[in-house]
């Protein structure tokens, strides 16, 4: 700088200008190329967004910048003659190795410089012409821009920011690649220099580079504070600039707009030139990548040559290595100056004394010059009111520090390296994330509902609060047509009348229109079947009363009945067997109904003297009611001799009989007497009933071929024992639909089971299929099963005595499937209807061996149903239990060896039974009183006893009676009422009997 010229802030070297001047003076084609590339890159980066958006800038500022650059070039040429000599020496040493390449690069550089100077001159001329042609347009545009600046600010800022950020990103990527490559070269050179120079202090520059790596670590902690102070100073600087711009607002709008137009025009032209140069530089850069290896080798030689030149000669090359770190320059004043002075002081202590002095003088001169320039520039701005144009809202904020004049430059290599690495790492992550975002894309084609909660209605809410858990109410509706409706109206007046058809009197109708509804007499409801039953019972009572009155009158045959009362009875009566059709007929059998105890049937043989041709050849059966002894209720006739008989198990309306010819006959006592034969005897008509159904002559394949020994009803558990005080005969409606079984046993051991069937309707003309059915009858027998008892009754010793003969059969009342059969060998067979295996199969007497003893009668106890009595022909009486083969008790000499012909339990006392033998004796047994023999016996003579049966009412224990119905050889039948001691049960007699049986 000339001593007489006043120095201002513009005279101070800027970082870009200083690097440019040093590299141009060095004369190296490589350095010139790098400088051009960096400048073109920087100009394109700063000018691209401004040119595209037509931002207004100050043209005078650009002109002043060019003048200052020329002055710096002149100042540099005068201030550094020594550096130029060093560079010329360096050029001469490298001239032999790079003649061809240097010539090419120099020619290219000169052409570019010439083109640049020529283009600048043309730009000025074009700018003047454009300024003259578009002056009016610019004025209108300036006025329009000033008016619409505030409205377009935000919109333009967003657009410019997007475009500028895109351009900066591209430029930074290219710059990062170049910086990474330069960093690698610098690090390689640093290692080589370190190996070459080591820690020698004779080479201060190499030693300073060696120490730089260690100092970077200490600078990291200071970088944060420096950046913070830098931001604070930047904010303060912006405030000062804003204040200065407010003072300089006195400039006319015309001048401001002209400057903006000139600035935009120049920057646009510069942007075009720099864009063309940057494109050419890119092509040259690609071509020089191939020569990179050769350049590295040449640089090593250059470093070896520079060892003799000293630190002053190495300075330009050092500047070249760090040319890309212009963004890391910081404005230093205040605390930064003190820090720089402290660091320079530490370095000066390590350098030689002469070099320390030289460095200190340079630093003092630079600091003094910067202070003076700052003061002068501030005074100048205050006097002239000159300020820079206010930056637009859309201008990039990073450009303001570069336009602000600086007073000093400090190169922070550690921070620059750290920032560069951070930028590269962030850029890589951003690039990777953008690529991944293109690959990873969410698919919105499917939509799933994670929770679908429909609204809750009132019914569901009620069930949730008051209903049972895990249950749901359901309802159905049927019979939809049955709809009821309620209406409100007046009562309907009604009247009831009655009539009778056919009329049986004068009053055949009732009711009157004159009478009110309340006066009408309500006719009571009449139950006709119930009335009929009542009348029937009443008639029976009346008949009994009349019978008693007749007995009291004392007929001829009554006094003798009282004289015939036995010792075992309190009173006696005699049935009227002196009827004309019963005279000279002996009684062969007596049977009492177990359901209706007052009903007894007597079987009469053929008469000894002829009486009536229609009756003399027929056997008679008379059904008696012991309460009406004057005459039989029904008189039945049979063609064959009757050997056994029984009543139906439920009600005594059916009578079954077995004949000597093997046939089974049935009488239905409910039939109308008009369908039977009537005979007039002694001025009285008697109805003689023929059998309703007979198996004689039909069903020959299953019918018996030998005389029947027994016939028994097969009782069931559903049958209930009843005592009928009233009439034993009911109407057909009451008995309709009944069905049960009857078993018939002959002496050969054939047991037939018959089903009693009641037809729904009687046919008066008879049946063509059922030949055994009487015309108008409704009861018939259907064969069910046949059981052959001969095989089960065979014994190994029975061959000596011939075939076994069966004499009697009884079914177990509690289980009609089981039955026992008495034989003529003293054995009692135990079998079932389904041929099941039973135990024991045979009940035997206490004596071992087989004896020709007939088991004439068997009777089950009505109280202890598993216990039965057996009377034998040898006079022995056995008490068997169904579960034991041998008898519980056996009495051998109770009848003095006379055969037992009849044996029955008392219907009122569990421990009492009566026995009849063939010697016309009656024995009364009371096991609780004496279990060794009978407690009473009654011989009957001279009219001997033929048959005996017991009648009574077990349900009426207090007022009950037990009577013996005795048939004598003379054909008379009398009723003996037993004494109360044998009819009234004792306390707990049933339980005492069980204890006795268990012993």
UniProtKB/Swiss-Prot annotation:
Entry-linked Gene3D superfamilies: YVTN repeat-like/Quinoprotein amine dehydrogenase
Enumerate the subcellular locations listed in this protein's record, separating them with semicolons. Cell projection, Cilium; Cytoplasm, Cytoskeleton, Microtubule organizing center, Centrosome
Answer whether the UniProt record assigns the keyword Phosphoprotein to this protein. Answer: yes
Q: Which residues carry this modification: Phosphoserine?
A: 250
Q: Which UniProt keywords apply?
A: Cell projection, Cilium, Cilium biogenesis/degradation, Cytoplasm, Cytoskeleton, Phosphoprotein, Repeat, WD repeat
Give any single GO term for biological process: intraciliary retrograde transport
Q: How does it assemble?
A: Intermediate chain of the cytoplasmic dynein complex 2, a multisubunit complex, composed at least of eleven different proteins. The cytoplasmic dynein 2 complex consists of two catalytic heavy chains (HCs) and a number of non-catalytic subunits presented by intermediate chains (ICs), light intermediate chains (LICs) and light chains (LCs).
What the protein does?
Acts as one of several non-catalytic accessory components of the cytoplasmic dynein 2 complex (dynein-2 complex), a motor protein complex that drives the movement of cargos along microtubules within cilia and flagella in concert with the intraflagellar transport (IFT) system. DYNC2I1 plays a major role in retrograde ciliary protein trafficking in cilia and flagella. Also requires to maintain a functional transition zone.
Protein name per Swiss-Prot or TrEMBL: Cytoplasmic dynein 2 intermediate chain 1
Q: What is the species listed in this Swiss-Prot or TrEMBL entry? A: Mus musculus (Mouse)
Traced from the root, the source organism's taxonomic lineage reads: Eukaryota, Metazoa, Chordata, Craniata, Vertebrata
């Amino acid at each position: 700088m000339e001593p007489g010229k006043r120095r201002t802030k513009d005279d101070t070297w800027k970082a870009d200008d200083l690097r440019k001047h040093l590299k141009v003076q060095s004369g190296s084609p490589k350095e010139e190329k790098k400088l051009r590339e960096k400048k073109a890159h920087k100009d394109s980066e700063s000018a691209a967004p401004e040119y595209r958006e037509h931002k207004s800038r100050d043209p005078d500022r650009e002109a002043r910048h060019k003048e200052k650059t020329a002055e710096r070039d002149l100042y540099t040429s005068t201030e550094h003659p020594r550096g130029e000599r060093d560079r010329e020496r360096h050029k001469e040493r490298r001239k032999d190795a790079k003649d061809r390449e240097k010539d090419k690069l120099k020619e290219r550089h000169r052409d570019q410089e010439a083109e640049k100077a020529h283009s600048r001159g043309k730009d000025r001329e074009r700018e003047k012409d454009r300024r003259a042609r578009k002056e009016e347009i610019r004025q209108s545009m300036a006025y329009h821009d000033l008016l619409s600046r505030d409205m377009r600010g935000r919109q333009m800022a967003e657009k410019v920011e997007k475009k500028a950020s895109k351009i900066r990103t591209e430029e930074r990527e290219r710059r990062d690649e170049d910086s990474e490559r330069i960093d690698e070269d610098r690090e390689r050179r640093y290692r080589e220099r370190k190996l070459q120079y080591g820690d020698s202090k004779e080479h201060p520059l190499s030693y300073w580079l060696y120490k730089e790596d260690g100092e970077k670590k200490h600078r990291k902690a200071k970088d944060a504070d420096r950046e913070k102070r830098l931001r604070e100073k930047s904010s303060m600087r912006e405030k000062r600039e804003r204040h200065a711009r407010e003072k300089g607002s006195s400039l006319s709008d015309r001048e401001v707009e002209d400057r903006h137009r000139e600035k935009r025009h120049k920057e646009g032209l510069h942007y075009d030139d720099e864009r063309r140069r940057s494109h050419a530089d890119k092509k040259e850069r690609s071509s020089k990548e191939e020569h990179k290896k050769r350049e590295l080798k040449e640089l090593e030689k250059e470093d070896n040559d520079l060892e003799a030149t000293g630190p002053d000669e190495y300075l330009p090359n050092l500047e070249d290595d760090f040319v890309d770190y212009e963004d890391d320059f910081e404005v230093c004043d205040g605390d930064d100056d003190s820090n720089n002075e402290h660091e320079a002081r530490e370095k000066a202590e390590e350098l030689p004394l002469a070099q320390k002095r030289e460095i200190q003088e340079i630093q003092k001169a630079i600091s003094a010059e910067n202070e003076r320039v700052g003061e002068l520039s501030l005074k100048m701005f205050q006097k002239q009111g000159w300020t820079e144009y206010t930056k637009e809202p859309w201008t990039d904020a990073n450009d303001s520090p570069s336009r602000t004049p600086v007073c000093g430059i400090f190169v922070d290599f550690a921070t620059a390296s750290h920032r560069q690495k951070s930028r590269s790492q962030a850029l890589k992550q951003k690039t990777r994330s953008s690529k991944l975002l293109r690959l990873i894309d969410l698919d919105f084609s499917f939509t799933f509902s994670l929770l679908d909660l429909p609204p809750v209605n009132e019914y569901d809410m009620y069930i949730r609060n008051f209903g049972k858990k895990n249950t749901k109410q359901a309802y159905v509706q049927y019979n939809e047509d049955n709809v009821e409706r309620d209406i409100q109206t007046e009562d309907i007046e009604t009247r009831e009348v009655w009539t009778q058809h056919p009329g049986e009197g004068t009053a055949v109708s009732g009711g009157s229109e004159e009478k009110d509804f309340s006066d009408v007499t309500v006719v009571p409801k009449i139950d006709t079947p119930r009335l009929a039953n009542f009348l029937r019972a009443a008639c029976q009572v009346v008949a009994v009363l009349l019978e008693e009155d007749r007995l009291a009158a004392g007929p001829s045959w009554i006094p003798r009945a009282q004289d015939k009362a036995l010792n075992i009875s309190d009173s006696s009566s005699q049935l009227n067997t002196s009827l004309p059709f019963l005279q000279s007929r002996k009684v062969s059998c007596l049977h009492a109904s177990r359901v209706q105890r007052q009903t007894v049937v007597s079987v009469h043989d053929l008469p000894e003297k002829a009486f009536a041709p229609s009756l003399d050849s027929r056997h008679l059966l008379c059904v008696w009611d012991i309460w009406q002894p004057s005459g039989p209720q029904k008189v039945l006739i049979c063609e064959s001799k009757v050997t056994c008989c029984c009543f139906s198990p439920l009600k005594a309306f059916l009578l079954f009989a077995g004949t000597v010819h093997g046939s089974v006959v049935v009488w239905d006592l409910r039939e109308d007497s008009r369908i039977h034969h009537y005979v007039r005897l002694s001025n009285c008509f008697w109805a003689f009933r023929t059998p309703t159904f007979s198996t004689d002559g039909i069903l020959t394949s299953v019918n018996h071929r030998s005389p029947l020994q027994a016939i028994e009803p097969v009782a069931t558990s559903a049958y209930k024992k009843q005592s009928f005080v009233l009439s034993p005969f009911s109407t057909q409606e009451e008995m309709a639909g009944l069905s049960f079984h009857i078993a018939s046993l002959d002496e050969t051991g054939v047991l037939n089971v018959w089903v009693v069937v009641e037809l729904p309707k009687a046919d008066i003309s008879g049946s063509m299929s059922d030949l055994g059915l009487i015309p108008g009858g409704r009861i018939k027998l259907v064969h069910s099963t046949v059981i052959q008892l001969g095989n089960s009754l065979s014994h190994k010793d029975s061959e000596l005595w011939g075939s076994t003969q069966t004499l009697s059969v009884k079914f177990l009342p509690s289980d009609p499937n089981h039955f026992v059969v008495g034989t003529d060998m003293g054995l009692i067979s135990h079998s079932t209807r389904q041929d099941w295996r039973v135990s024991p199969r045979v009940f035997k007497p206490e004596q071992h061996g087989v004896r020709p003893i007939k088991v004439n009668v068997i009777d089950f106890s009505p109280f202890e149903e598993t216990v039965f009595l057996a009377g034998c022909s040898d006079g022995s009486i056995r008490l068997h239990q169904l579960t034991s083969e041998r008898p519980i008790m056996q009495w051998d000499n109770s009848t003095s060896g006379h055969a037992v012909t009849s044996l029955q339990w008392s219907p009122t006392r569990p421990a009492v039974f009566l026995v009849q033998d063939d010697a016309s004796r009656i024995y009364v047994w009371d096991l609780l009183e004496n279990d060794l023999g009978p407690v009473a016996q009654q011989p009957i003579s001279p009219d001997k006893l033929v048959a005996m049966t017991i009648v009574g009412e077990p349900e009426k224990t207090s007022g009950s009676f037990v009577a013996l119905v005795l048939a004598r050889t003379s054909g008379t039948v009398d009723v003996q009422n037993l004494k109360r001691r044998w009819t009234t049960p004792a306390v707990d007699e049933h339980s005492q009997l069980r204890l006795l049986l268990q012993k």
